[in-house]
């Protein structure tokens, strides 16, 4: 946290390669996280986003603009400084619910080196639903590319590997909640069912285009 009370991400469409609507759809409604021992105390109190041109409007009162500030922030000697006359206040009401999701995995045991592993993985989640803009619009983010193609890849690999012997063991893992911040992968890394130091190679499949 480095002493920060809040973290606000500035969205620029060109370098991000996705429009503001993706941010809106991802950050409206419930936000998911792992159940942590410190109950999230390591996170800042406020996490938010702002569009670059909206930030420019806000900064008019300070004598700065976003591009100038970005150049300053990229300098090796940069250190934080306050904006005179600019403050932020926010009021948040939230509720906590406990839900359960799953990583799904399978293992093919190796013939001569069963304690060494090749890992194939892909995330199975996507973004859920969006509010319809027009009547009759598809409200489901189907996720054919991100990431049904990735999951299909590890399923096909599992099918092919089931037909042959392998020297090392092979793990096929479909992780949850990638779109919420790689949470399924984080859980696997934190509570691995195997010794991760014995994973000799890993392949992640995400957004494979036809």
PLM feature segments, named:
Residues 15, 27, 100, 128-210:
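Acidic/histidine-rich catalytic neighborhood of metal-dependent amide-processing enzymes
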Residues 5-10, 46-50, 105, 117-121, ...:
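Structural recognition of the beta-strand scaffold that forms the well-ordered cores
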Residues 8-15, 54-58, 112, 126, ...:
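Short loop/turn segments at secondary-structure transitions that flank enzyme active sites
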Residues 25, 56-61, 187-190:
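Charged/polar, solvent-exposed surface patches and flexible loops
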Residues 36-143, 156-159, 163, 167:
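Soluble metallo-hydrolase cores and metallopeptidase-like ectodomains found primarily
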Residues 1-39, 43-44, 109, 117, ...:
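Extracellular/luminal Protease-associated
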Residues 21-27, 69-74, 187:
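Generic hydrophobic, helix-prone segments enriched in Leu/Val/Ile
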């Amino acid at each position: 946290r480095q002493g920060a009370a809040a973290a606000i991400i500035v969205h620029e469409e060109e370098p991000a390669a996705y429009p503001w609507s993706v941010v809106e759809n991802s950050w409206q409604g419930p936000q998911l996280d792992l159940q942590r021992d410190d109950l999230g105390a390591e996170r800042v109190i406020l996490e938010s986003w702002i569009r670059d041109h909206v930030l420019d409007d806000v900064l008019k009162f300070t004598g700065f603009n976003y591009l100038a500030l970005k150049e300053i922030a990229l300098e090796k000697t940069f250190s934080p400084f306050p904006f005179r006359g600019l403050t932020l206040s926010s009021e948040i009401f939230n509720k906590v619910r406990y839900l359960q999701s799953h990583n799904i995995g399978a293992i093919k045991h190796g013939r001569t080196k069963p304690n060494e592993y090749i890992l194939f993985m892909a995330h199975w989640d996507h973004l859920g639903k969006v509010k319809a803009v027009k009547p009759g619009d598809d409200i489901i983010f189907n996720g054919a590319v991100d990431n049904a193609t990735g999951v299909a890849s590890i399923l096909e690999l599992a099918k092919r590997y089931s037909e042959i012997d392998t020297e090392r063991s092979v793990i096929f893992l479909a992780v949850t909640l990638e779109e919420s911040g790689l949470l399924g992968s984080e859980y696997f890394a934190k509570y691995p069912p195997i010794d991760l130091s014995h994973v000799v190679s890993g392949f992640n499949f995400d957004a494979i285009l036809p």
